[in-house]
Amino acid sequence: MNRGGELLGEGNYGCVFHPPIRCDNEKRRRSGVGKVVQRLEDALDEIKIGKKLFKIDPKGKFTNPMMSTCTIKKKNITQKDEEKIICGATSTLNNNTSYKQIIYKYKGVDLSVSESIQVKHFYNLALGLKLFQENNLCHRDIKEENILDLGKRYVFIDFGLSCKLDEVYSMEDSSWLLHPYIYYPPEFKIYAMMNDLLELDDEYLNNTEELVDDIFQQVEDSGYFDQYAQYKADLKDVGVYKNRRGDIYNAIHTIVNDTIGTNMSSANMKKYYKKLAMKADVFSLGIVMFLMTANNEELSLNEK
């Protein structure tokens, strides 16, 4: 007999159940959706973010509100008759191991599996980004899987990579910024590559033209432009992608020259990167909107 909720999904850090897994020392399950997080450190980070989001969006207009947390036991997420672990993230631990469960208000489905796309609902997401920026917050991981379709509106979920706007460009984070990810703006790659090149000798660093060319070549070699190849025709139709030496190419060159080709003070450089950080989520949401609507034959031209 399954003593846990229905498994809705499983990621790198844990699993999501509906209804939530029964909390330890409680007879009834709580309402909502339960997220069981494998590592306590990750759970505490998510709880901290959840509390902040609840303060800025208590009614859940743009996010899925965190309602409560509790402790659960591994034995409560097994199927007794088959002794099969429902949540693979917990499969190596014993039945008495405790986990943190974070309970969210809404169930819904994410956009990657949603049966229909409502363009008007993206306006609500844009308002959500405005709210985040007003509260110095960057989501940093906007994609279809992290947008929840509630029927009447879309909301953002999974803020595990979120941070303050002035922390988006961080030396500690430079490695994951190199990820060849279509939702990440080109600035992420440039910043990470700049950090790598800081290890070089001063004579090379003082040669601005050579440094700019090297960084740009690395961005090009990373296949960033090629990520858009399969969408080239659609992008060209909406004026986003003119050609290989078009808008994207020139935009990257501009950013490299702005950050390296001028002698900015540390204070001004910090302001510049915060300004770029404010565009990161907007870029990601724009890519989601394009991918979800460009080839959707059910949408009218006006809706697109």
Regions found by a protein language model. Give the residues of each.
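Conserved hydrophobic alpha-helix
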Residues: 125-132
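Catalytic-loop of the protein kinase fold
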Residues: 133-150
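C-lobe/activation-segment region of protein kinase-like
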Residues: 155, 159-297
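ATP-binding glycine-rich loop module of kinase domains
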Residues: 10-83
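Conserved C-terminal C-lobe helix
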Residues: 303-304
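Conserved structural core of kinase catalytic domains
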Residues: 61-118
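Conserved N-terminal boundary motif of the eukaryotic protein kinase catalytic domain
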Residues: 1-7
